[in-house]
Regions:
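ATP-dependent carboxylate-amine ligase
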Residues: 2-146
């Protein structure tokens, strides 16, 4: 897990490995960091690989946990089960088919927000983390993509 303090935005990049236990720990960390900073919490999460026949259930449970923890925005890349899990909660769900589509929502990030990027390595979500770093590490960028 890598922390990148980009001034206004805090990025938690854990895009290299994901299983139910590490996803749970990462979401709990996101919730705590967001409470400390006072901004919105954003979870950009992708598929957890090698879960076997219960894969859909595990993904839905992670979505449910995000809702229970009060994560503000759950951005799912290609996994509708995460969005199913947040039904009935105050968490806003955003489902995108691929990474490129998901980057469209980055312009909604704002000061004091905490962003988690997490998935199994094969999903390539480090691209989202790199995009966030490139946008927010420019002094005075304020989240405006250049």
């Amino acid at each position: 897990m890598e922390l990148h303090d980009l001034g206004e935005i805090l990025l938690v990049n854990d895009s290299y490995n994901a299983n139910p236990e590490s996803m749970t720990a990462a979401l709990r960390t996101l919730a705590l960091l967001s409470q400390e900073r006072g901004g919105n919490s954003w979870a950009f999460i992708g598929k957890m690989h090698e879960l076997g026949v219960d894969s859909e259930l595990f993904h839905k449970q992670i979505g449910k946990l995000a809702g229970e923890l009060g994560i503000d925005h759950l951005v799912s890349i290609g996994v509708p089960e995460y969005i199913e899990g947040i039904e009935g909660t105050n968490t806003s769900g955003h489902l995108f088919a691929d990474i490129q589509s998901a980057t469209q929502i980055l312009n909604r990030l704002s000061g004091a927000d905490v962003v988690l990027v997490k998935a199994s390595r094969a999903e390539g979500l480090e691209e989202i983390a790199e995009r966030i770093i490139s946008i927010w590490s420019v002094p005075g960028a304020g989240g405006v993509e250049r």
